[in-house]
């Protein structure tokens, strides 16, 4: 009898443990109700007609041949921006690894305003046999009011493509490669392996600076099939600090005035080696403590991520590493700054409506593969602790239902139905093939750290290998219980894709955010938002008097239900997807004729902190951020109502209003 009681107790205990470990699952009716709020139409991205043959793997250094599919797993990237100056972020700049081309084109469905064209660096030197583009940034790098582009590569340093001042748009002229002048960011012909980049005013002088994140060590020959020797990989699986450097560039006034020119000064030794040489895959910049100096989040492969507190002054860069605190119930790897996961994507957003930015980070969370955990670093609000070196964040991904999905790269937070609550999405997938190589990768994960740096000891990851090559990109929506649920299946977003970057923008000005996924070794797609019955919204194009996007400007507002919303003009946060430099708030059931009080904070182009409170009716507004001191509006309490549009421009589904002090 006792024998049977013991067996029964073991069965009951196992059943209880199983029930406790299962994730809550909504009913089919509840899932259908969540999915009914959203609808997206998929369109392939345009290509140039002479793009050449597709390839499915890169030529690599001979010592890396056995892992050529692994080395070839990055490169797809996309940026959404207003490149042609029509007032809408309806232009694409994307990288297709199948052709190694950087293509600029109108977003599908936004009229054929110009023919797609390739952004090649000629006449600058670029060896196509050993170089590959990895991503792009859009920004006004010479502060002339025109949108420029930056392309970063494996095998060379980044290139600036500066827009010429021309009669484009006034007499039938169209945007083309001839409108851009290629310029070196760095002279000297060094070999960099850049995986990500971000722009922000790092030192608070009022000008936007650049941070380039490299993956493989600087000077390597990763894509040179004729090189000798043996390339070095990560020095360990959980604390690899031998990767490429993070390079910081401070903006400088250009010396040339009669042609497009930009000048940046590289500042050395800004970071310690522990920060500077992680194997970086994603970076983000956002003001997290309210001083309008951007903190930096650096997401690293094979090692801990880094959150850096910005303590800089104009011309003097200074950052301090922040680390989280651990209690009895928190695993070490779920403490900020102590994780050993594979950070691959990062985004900022206020997930709980408390008026503070939280941090969403992608890692690897593959069932039957490598189940780490994604991070949702929820702000505790104790921002004063940053001065003590403490990161005031706790990991809430498991509680919120955002800890698991797949082999994830880009992480994104955005409000796609304008209800005032952010949705979450990720780009997933690693290597697509027919032979499951997870057992071999798991064996590598349990091997001695002393051999991981040598590619001879790695498993066979050549073409044909499969590592999470059939993942679907998740689309998480918050349920009534406060948890997030993946509704990709009922939405029809179930085609497996090996995705890397996600770019978000309202490409047609209708108030509904659209997105583009950049896919590795496959076609990339626009997902046009056709969601029914969306709420009201407030959209802000915040610009300086010269027309440059006010990167780093912060907007805040409150909703009747008590939620506080905050967002910033983003300068490229993420892995390889770049959202447009706009601010978008979903307002829910707000009356569309009722003004919204919004508070804007920014640094002007002299580096002085400015605040301005104004009222705007829902819709898109372009707000020129002038020096409010000269207008006698020096505090947020001095409210100013902005009355209707000084001028308006018709756009598909909406009106773009321009408002000025």
Segment roles from a protein language model:
Residues 91-96, 146-153, 210-214, 291-300, ...:
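Hydrophobic beta-strand segments that make up the repeating blades of beta-propeller
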Residues 29-34, 100-120, 157-180, 222-236, ...:
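Beta-propeller blade repeat segments, especially FG-GAP/WD-type strand-to-loop junctions
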Residues 214-241, 362-369, 428-467:
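Short, conserved, GDST-rich strand-edge loop motifs in beta-rich repeat architectures
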Residues 2-49, 53-69, 73-77, 468-473, ...:
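Gly/Ser/Thr/Pro-enriched helix-cap/hinge segments flanking short amphipathic alpha-helices
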Residues 75-85, 105, 132-147, 161, ...:
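Beta-propeller blade termini
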Residues 48-77, 123-137, 185-198, 242, ...:
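Repeat-based blade/solenoid architectures
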Residues 191-211, 339-435, 497-499, 503-535, ...:
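Repeat-solenoid scaffold signature
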């Amino acid at each position: 009898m006792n024998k049977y009681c013991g067996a029964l107790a073991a069965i009951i205990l196992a059943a209880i443990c199983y029930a406790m470990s299962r994730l809550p699952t909504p009913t089919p009716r509840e899932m259908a109700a969540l999915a009914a709020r959203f609808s997206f139409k998929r369109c392939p991205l345009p290509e140039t007609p002479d793009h050449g043959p597709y390839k499915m793997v890169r030529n690599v250094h001979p010592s890396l041949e056995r892992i050529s599919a692994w080395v070839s797993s990055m490169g797809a990237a996309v940026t959404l921006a207003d490149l042609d100056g029509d007032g809408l972020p309806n232009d694409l700049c994307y990288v297709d690894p199948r052709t190694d081309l950087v293509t600029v084109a109108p977003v599908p469905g936004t009229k054929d305003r110009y023919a797609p064209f390739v952004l090649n660096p000629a006449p600058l030197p670029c060896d196509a046999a050993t170089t590959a583009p990895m991503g792009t940034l859009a920004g006004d790098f010479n502060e002339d009011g025109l949108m420029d582009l930056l392309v970063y590569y494996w095998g060379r340093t980044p290139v600036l493509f500066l827009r010429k001042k021309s009669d484009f748009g006034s007499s039938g002229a169209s945007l083309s490669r001839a409108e851009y002048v290629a310029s070196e960011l760095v002279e000297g012909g060094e070999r960099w392996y850049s995986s990500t980049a971000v722009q922000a005013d790092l030192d608070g002088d009022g000008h936007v600076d650049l941070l380039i994140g490299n993956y493989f060590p600087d000077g390597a020959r990763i894509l040179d099939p004729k090189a000798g020797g043996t390339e070095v990989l990560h020095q360990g699986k959980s604390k690899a600090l031998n990767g490429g450097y993070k390079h910081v560039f401070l903006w400088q006034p250009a010396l040339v005035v009669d042609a497009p020119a930009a000048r940046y000064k590289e500042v050395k030794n800004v970071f310690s080696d522990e920060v500077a040489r992680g194997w970086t895959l994603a970076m983000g910049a956002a003001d997290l403590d309210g001083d309008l100096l951007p903190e930096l989040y650096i997401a690293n492969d094979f090692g801990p991520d880094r959150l850096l507190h910005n303590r800089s002054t104009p011309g003097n860069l200074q950052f301090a590493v922040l680390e989280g605190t651990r209690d009895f119930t928190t695993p070490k790897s779920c403490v900020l700054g102590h994780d050993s996961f594979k950070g691959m994507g990062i985004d900022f957003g206020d997930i709980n409506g408390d008026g503070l930015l939280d941090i969403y980070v992608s890692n690897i969370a593959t069932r039957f593969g490598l189940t780490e955990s994604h991070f949702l670093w929820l702000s505790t609000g104790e921002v004063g602790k940053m001065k003590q070196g403490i990161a005031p964040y706790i990991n809430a991904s498991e509680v919120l239902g955002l800890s698991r999905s797949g082999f994830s790269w880009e992480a994104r937070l955005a409000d796609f139905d304008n209800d005032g609550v952010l949705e979450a999405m990720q780009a997933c997938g690693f290597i697509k093939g027919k032979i499951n190589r997870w057992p071999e990768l798991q064996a590598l994960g349990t091997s001695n750290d002393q051999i991981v740096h040598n590619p001879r000891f790695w498993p066979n990851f050549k073409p044909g290998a499969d590592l999470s090559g059939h993942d679907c990109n998740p689309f998480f929506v918050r349920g009534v219980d406060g948890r997030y649920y993946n509704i990709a299946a009922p939405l029809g977003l179930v085609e497996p894709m090996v995705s890397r970057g996600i770019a978000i923008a309202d490409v047609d000005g209708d108030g509904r955010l659209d997105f583009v996924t950049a896919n590795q070794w496959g076609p990339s797609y626009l997902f046009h938002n056709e969601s029914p019955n969306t709420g009201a919204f407030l959209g802000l194009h915040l610009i300086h008097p010269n027309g440059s996007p006010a990167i780093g400007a912060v907007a805040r507002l409150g909703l009747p239900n008590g939620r506080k919303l905050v967002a910033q003009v983003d300068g490229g946060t993420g892995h390889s997807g770049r959202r447009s430099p706009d601010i978008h708030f979903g307002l829910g059931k707000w009356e569309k004729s009722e003004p919204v009080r919004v508070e804007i904070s920014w640094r002007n182009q002299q580096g002085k902190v400015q605040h301005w409170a104004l009222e705007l009716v829902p819709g898109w507004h372009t707000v020129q951020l002038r020096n409010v001191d000269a207008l006698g509006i020096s505090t947020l309490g001095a409210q100013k109502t902005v009355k209707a549009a000084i001028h308006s421009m018709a756009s598909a589904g909406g009106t773009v209003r321009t408002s000025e002090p």
